[in-house]
Amino acid sequence: MKLDYTRIIGLVVVGISITVIFGTMLPQNDMDYSENLSEPITENSNPLIVIVAPSIHEKYYKEVFQEVIDYDVMAVNAMYGKDDIILLADKATIGYFEGRVPDEVLVTSNVVDIWIRDFGTVNTTTEVKFEYRPQYLSVSESDWIDESYEDWFSARELTSKKTDLILDGGNLVFNGQDKAITSVRVFADNPQYSQDEIDQMLKELLEVTEIAYLPEEEGDITGHSDGMVMWVEYDRLLVNEYKEPFRTQVLTELEESLSDIEIIEIPYVFQEGLWKGWPSACGYYLNSLVTENYIYVPVYGLEEDEYVLELIQSYTNKEVVSINAEDVCFMGGSVRCLTWTTDGTDANKILEFAEQN
């Protein structure tokens, strides 16, 4: 894919500034739908990043075990010293990291899957545990994964709101203040509720005032929004530079749903390939992990990597840090998919446990 990086056009549409970088009142109800066990996240608390290693005993990842371990080592070392971070691994696997990452980040745990973003709590200014029951997994598979996380979560005495709404963490992108983005998959996953009911429930649960519901990318199994968009600042949103007519569908939804933001289109490089039926995520730069002071951006060994890193850096005061995701992106996910973050009291509890152990 050859990109022409010289053409930049600024647009203003219904109060939203859109920079294009060219390449080649709702009904009320009284439903009790959540259990509020969440402690407020303090405004300036430091984020804690959590990564989960694959188990040496897990057959599903057997053929890519070493690649994922190597990626985890690289990612932990790149993030260590910038943000608080821990790496969860079971007893049989933790030895693969000893001497390769700082000892204090290693925590023994039996969380069974690496894609913790999807089944972990969703963190805005509060913390919400959604039902993990995605279309792309069987009920037994999703229950097995979710129960392992819930066991770990409750053992640490962590707190969150709980709801019966089905939503993957990878399908919620929060701007840090009052806006969130998901996809229309949330409507399909929760047919027992109307779209207006879901919108109201999400705004109350997440404590936001505006939500955009993006159309799904063609061929995307997950229906996630976190490979499509990324907030680099609370009022500045990066969006993949899609082809028409999908581009207009995405931009129209963002323009009509979110106020007072700047939208910037960023090149991405679609890569063919399937792994166990999962389309590759290689070339998707917006599946980045954003924290208070850093943006960890995946790179893929592509000629566009350096340009996109510089471009993202030009739109944010946060420091952009590259993370080589070549060892994992072919499995259908990238940097954000493989991390979970929490703040405040829960982060402190996890760090205290890690220090004691």
Which residues make up each language-model segment?
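Histidine/cysteine-enriched polar flanking segments
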Residues: 3-11, 15, 21-357
